C-alpha cells in the first residue's frame, strides 16, 4: 500500500522536527513495516513553468518553431519546438538542461541538454504530457500537442511538482504487516496511528448526512449476515469531467490512476478512510429500489471489464428490481457503469462480511482495491465517514449537484469489544511496571475507552479495531507494548521451572535425522508447499482417489494436497537441474490423506496427516547413485540410535524402475521404499539426461531406542591398516550378507563399489570392500595382515562361495 504524507498531514499536524526517515522508522517499529520512502518530486527535477513571449518560424524546418520563453530568470531563453498548439502568452512545461524526459513519450528516459536543432540553438524542451508524466492530468489530443498551463494558477519558474502537488513523500507499506488491521487501509487510519505515536491531536472528520426530509431510497437486504449495512444516495446534476488536479495527484500518489471526477471521488474516499464506494448510473437502474441478495441459479453478470461470469447461489449481488448490477464488494456491472452521458448517480456506501467477499473473489479470480479492504473485515461505522466525505466532495466539485434520495439499511452494527485485563498481567508480561495513568494514556491515544477499578482495566475497544483485531487481553497488551516501543523494554528470560526431566524421543530423532542427512551425507534440505502441481502427481503414477482437493486452490493446477513427498521432490529436481548436474536433497514434511485422523469437533473434520521423510540423489551413473543412497539408508539406524531397518523386494513403488527398487521394513512392516526413478516418470516430469535415486520413509513408524548403555572404547594405540578387496560373488548375494560376516572379523568394513563388466563371468558380479585391521598389542606385520585376509577369504568362500577376483 502507498501512503502519501501530504495526504496524512491533512488529518494530523506532525512535529516539525520529525524527518521522513525517523517517521518511517517509528511507523515500522510501532505499527506497520515501511519498505520504501519515495520522493515524488525527484522525477520533476528541473521541469518548470515557462511563458511563451515569441513564436517564430524555423528558418530551415517547416514543422519547427523558434520560441522565446520566460522561465522566471533575468532573461528569456530560446527553445526550438514542434508543438502544434503554441501561441504567445501560453504557459507551458519546460524541461531545463539536466531534466530527464521520455522523448515523444516513448523509450527510456533521455537527459535534456542545450543543443542545436537544424542549426538553431535550443536551451531546453517545451514538453507534451506523455513526456513528463502528465498524461493523466492533461490528456493530449495528438502526439504534437504540448501541455497548456494557461488555466492553471502558476507563474514562470514555478516547479511542476509544486504546481500539481507532486512535492510529496510516499511510503511503501508492506501489505502483510497490516493484514489484520483494516483500519489502516486508508490515510486517516495511518494518521490516527501517527497521532498516537507522537502524542499530537487527530483532526476529527465531520459527519454529514443527507437531510432527513428528502425522499427515502428503498433498500432491501435479503441476508443481513453477509451485508450488515447498506447506504445509498441518489445524486442528480453530475457529469463526467476531469477531477481537480489536487485529487488526481492524491490518487496517483496513493497508487491508482485518475479516471473521471465521479469515479475519482469514490476512489479518493476509499484511500482516505478505507471505505470502498461504488457509483451506479441512476438512469440505468430499473425501479427505485436496491436489493442485496444471493444470486439466483443460472444468473449471469457482465462486469465492468466486460468479463461475463456465471453466478452461483453463494455469490452476493447488488440488484435493481430486474437483475444483478454488481458483484457485491468486488466489481460493478457494465450496464450500470459511469459513461460519458451520465447525468446522475446512485452512490453505494456499504459493508460486506470478509468471508463472503473472499470466497466470491477466489471463485471468479477477481481481486480489486475494494475487495482487498472488505476481506480485512471493515466496521459498519466507517460507512458514515465514507458517505460524509463523498457528499462533501460532490458538493465541492459539482456545486450544482442535488441529493434527491437517501437510504440506510443498518441491521447489524459492529459491536465494541470489551476486554478486561489485570494490572498484574500487564506487569508480568511487559516485564516492566507501568503506572495506571501511563497505561490509560497509551490506550486512550489509540481510541480505547478505559476504566480502572480493583486492579482491573476494563477496556472498550473502538469499532475500527473490533472486527477481529482486538478481542483478548494479549491484544491489549500488544497495543501497549508497541506504542511505548519494544526497544524500551529490557529483555528478560522467561521463568521456567522443571519438575521432571523432559524426554521427547521423536523430536530428538527428527533432529538427528536432519543432521545425519545434512552433515554426514551431504544432503541439502528443501521445503515445498503442501499443494502439488498435478503434472508431477501424474508423473509419479500416484492414485489421487484418496487425495484431498482444495476448494479454492492458489491456482488451477495446484488443486491437490500432497499424499506423498515424491511429486514435490520431482518438481524440486526438475527446477534445480537448470543449475546443477549432481546434487542431493531431502525433505521432512506432513502429507494429507482423505479420512478422519482422530476424534475432533465437527467444524475441524481433520484429514489423516502423517510425517514422511524423503531424499534423492541426482547423477549420471544410475548404479552409483542407487548404491550411495542404499548406503545412506543402511547407516540410518546406526547413526540415529533407532531400531534396525531391513531391505527387501516386495512391492514396487509406482514411480520406480521395473528392476531397481527395494522396500524398507521395520519389524516385518513395510514403512518405505528405495528405488531408481523410472524413465517414464522422469520424462513426464520434464527431467532428461540424468538419473534419480529416491527414498521415502514413514517417519511416524521409525522407533527410537528408549535408552542405551554407552561402552567406552580406547582409541587404538597402534595404527590401523586399510586394505581393499575385490570379490567375485554370485549375482544373488547381497552386500548385507557379506557385511554380516566380515564385520565380525575386522575393526571396520565399508562398501566401495559394485562392478559388472566384460571380464566378469555371467551370473557373477564384483564387489569391492574396504577393511580396517588392527592389533591391540602392537603394529601388525605384513605376515599378520596376510594371515587375517586369508582367514576372511576362507570364511567367505565357505559360507557364500566367494573368491578373490583375479585382475
Where do the language-model regions lie?
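Phosphate-backbone binding interfaces of nucleic-acid-interacting proteins
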Residues: 1-208, 346, 364-365, 369, ...
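Glycine/proline-enriched, intrinsically flexible loops and inter-domain linkers
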Residues: 25, 65, 202-299
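Beta-rich nucleic-acid/ligand-interaction surfaces
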Residues: 42-45, 209-211, 269, 458-460, ...
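A carboxyl-terminal module marker
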Residues: 2, 445-448, 458, 598-601, ...
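Conserved mixed alpha/beta core segments that line enzyme active sites in large multi-domain catalysts
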Residues: 48-78, 266-335
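Extended, well-folded interaction surfaces typified by the phenylalanyl-tRNA synthetase beta subunit core
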Residues: 419-423, 427-583, 723, 770-774, ...
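Mobile "lid/hinge" segments at catalytic clefts and subdomain interfaces of large enzymes
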Residues: 118-133, 144-145, 165-167, 318-415, ...
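Class II aminoacyl-tRNA synthetase-like tRNA-binding/catalytic domains
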Residues: 90, 291-331, 335-338, 495-609, ...
Amino acid at each position: 500500500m502507498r501512503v502519501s504524507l501530504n495526504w496524512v498531514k491533512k488529518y494530523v499536524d506532525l512535529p516539525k522536527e520529525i524527518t521522513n526517515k525517523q517517521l518511517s522508522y517509528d511507523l515500522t517499529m510501532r505499527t506497520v513495516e515501511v519498505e520504501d520512502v519515495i520522493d515524488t518530486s525527484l522525477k520533476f527535477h528541473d521541469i518548470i513553468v515557462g511563458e511563451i513571449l515569441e513564436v517564430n518560424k524555423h528558418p530551415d524546418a517547416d514543422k519547427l518553431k523558434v520560441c522565446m520563453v520566460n522561465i522566471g530568470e533575468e532573461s528569456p531563453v530560446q527553445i526550438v519546438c514542434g508543438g502544434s498548439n503554441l501561441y504567445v502568452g501560453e504557459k507551458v512545461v519546460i524541461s531545463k538542461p539536466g531534466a530527464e524526459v521520455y522523448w515523444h513519450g516513448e523509450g527510456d528516459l533521455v537527459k535534456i541538454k542545450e543543443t542545436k536543432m537544424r542549426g538553431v540553438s535550443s536551451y531546453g524542451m517545451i514538453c507534451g504530457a506523455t513526456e513528463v508524466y502528465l498524461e493523466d492530468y492533461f490528456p493530449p489530443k495528438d502526439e504534437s500537442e504540448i501541455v497548456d498551463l494557461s488555466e492553471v494558477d502558476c507563474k514562470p519558474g514555478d516547479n511542476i511538482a509544486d504546481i500539481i502537488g507532486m512535492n510529496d513523500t510516499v511510503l511503501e507499506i508492506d501489505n502483510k504487516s497490516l493484514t489484520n488491521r483494516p483500519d489502516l487501509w486508508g490515510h486517516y487510519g495511518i494518521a490516527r496511528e501517527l497521532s498516537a505515536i507522537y502524542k499530537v491531536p487527530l483532526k476529527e472528520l465531520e459527519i454529514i448526512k443527507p437531510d432527513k426530509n428528502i425522499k427515502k431510497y428503498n433498500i432491501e437486504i435479503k441476508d443481513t449476515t453477509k451485508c450488515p449495512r447498506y447506504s445509498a444516495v441518489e445524486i442528480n446534476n453530475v457529469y463526467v469531467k476531469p477531477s481537480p488536479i489536487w485529487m488526481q495527484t492524491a490518487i496517483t500518489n496513493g497508487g491508482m490512476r485518475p479516471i473521471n471526477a465521479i469515479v475519482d471521488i469514490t476512489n479518493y474516499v476509499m484511500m482516505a478512510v478505507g471505505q470502498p464506494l461504488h457509483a451506479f448510473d441512476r438512469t440505468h437502474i430499473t425501479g427505485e429500489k436496491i436489493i442485496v441478495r444471493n444470486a439466483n441459479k443460472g444468473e449471469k453478470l457482465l462486469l465492468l471489464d466486460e468479463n461475463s461470469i456465471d453466478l452461483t447461489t453463494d455469490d452476493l449481488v447488488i440488484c435493481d428490481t430486474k437483475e444483478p448490477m454488481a458483484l457485491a464488494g468486488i466489481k460493478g456491472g457494465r450496464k450500470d457503469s459511469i459513461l460519458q452521458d451520465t447525468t446522475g448517480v446512485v452512490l453505494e456506501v456499504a459493508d460486506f462480511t470478509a468471508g463472503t467477499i473472499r470466497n466470491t473473489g477466489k471463485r471468479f479470480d477477481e481481486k480489486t482495491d475494494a475487495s482487498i479492504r472488505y476481506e480485512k473485515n471493515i466496521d459498519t461505522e466507517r460507512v458514515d465517514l465514507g458517505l460524509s466525505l463523498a457528499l462533501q466532495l460532490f458538493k465541492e466539485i459539482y456545486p450544482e449537484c442535488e441529493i434527491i434520495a437517501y437510504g440506510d439499511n443498518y441491521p447489524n452494527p459492529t459491536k465494541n469489544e470489551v476486554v478486561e485485563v489485570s494490572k498484574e498481567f500487564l506487569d508480568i508480561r511487559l516485564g516492566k511496571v507501568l503506572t495506571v495513568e501511563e497505561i490509560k494514556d497509551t490506550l486512550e491515544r489509540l481510541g480505547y475507552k478505559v476504566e480502572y477499578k480493583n486492579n482491573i482495566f476494563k477496556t472498550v475497544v473502538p469499532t475500527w479495531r473490533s472486527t477481529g483485531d482486538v478481542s483478548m487481553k494479549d491484544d491489549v497488551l500488544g497495543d501497549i507494548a508497541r506504542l511505548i516501543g519494544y526497544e524500551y523494554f529490557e529483555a528478560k528470560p522467561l521463568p521456567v521451572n522443571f519438575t521432571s526431566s523432559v524426554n521427547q524421543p521423536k523430536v530428538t530423532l527428527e533432529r538427528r535425522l536432519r543432521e545425519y542427512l545434512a552433515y554426514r551425507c551431504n544432503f541439502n534440505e528443501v521445503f515445498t508447499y503442501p499443494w502439488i502441481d498435478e503434472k508431477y502427481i501424474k508423473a509419479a503414477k500416484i492414485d489421487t482417489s484418496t487425495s484431498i482437493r482444495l476448494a479454492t486452490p492458489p491456482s488451477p493446477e495446484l488443486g491437490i494436497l500432497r499424499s506423498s513427498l515424491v511429486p514435490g521432490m520431482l518438481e524440486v529436481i526438475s527446477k534445480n537441474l537448470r543449475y546443477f548436474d549432481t546434487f542431493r536433497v531431502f525433505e521432512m514434511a506432513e502429507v494429507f490423506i482423505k479420512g478422519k485422523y482422530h476424534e475432533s469437533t465437527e467444524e475441524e473434520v481433520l484429514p489423516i496427516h502423517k510425517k514422511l521423510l524423503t531424499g534423492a540423489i541426482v547423477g549420471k551413473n544410475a548404479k552409483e547413485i542407487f548404491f550411495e543412497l542404499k548406503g545412506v539408508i543402511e547407516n540410518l539406524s546406526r547413526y540415529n540410535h533407532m531400531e534396525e531397518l531391513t531391505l527387501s523386494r516386495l512391492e514396487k513403488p509406482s514411480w520406480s524402475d521395473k528392476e531397481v527398487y527395494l522396500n524398507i521394513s521395520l519389524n516385518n512392516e513395510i514403512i518405505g521404499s528405495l528405488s531408481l526413478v523410472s524413465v517414464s516418470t522422469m520424462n513426464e516430469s520434464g527431467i532428461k539426461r540424468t538419473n534419480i535415486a529416491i527414498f521415502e520413509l514413514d517417519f511416524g513408524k521409525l522407533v527410537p531406542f528408549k535408552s542405551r548403555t554407552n561402552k567406552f572404547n580406547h582409541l587404538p594405540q597402534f595404527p590401523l591398516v586399510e586394505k581393499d578387496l575385490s570379490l567375485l560373488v554370485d549375482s544373488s548375494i547381497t552386500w548385507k550378507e557379506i557385511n554380516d560376516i566380515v564385520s565380525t572379523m575386522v575393526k571396520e568394513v565399508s562398501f566401495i563399489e559394485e562392478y559388472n563388466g566384460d571380464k566378469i563371468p555371467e551370473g557373477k558380479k564384483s564387489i569391492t570392500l574396504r577393511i580396517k585391521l588392527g592389533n591391540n598389542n602392537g603394529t601388525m606385520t605384513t605376515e599378520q595382515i596376510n594371515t587375517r585376509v586369508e582367514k576372511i577369504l576362507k570364511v567367505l568362500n565357505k559360507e557364500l562361495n566367494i573368491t578373490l577376483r583375479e585382475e
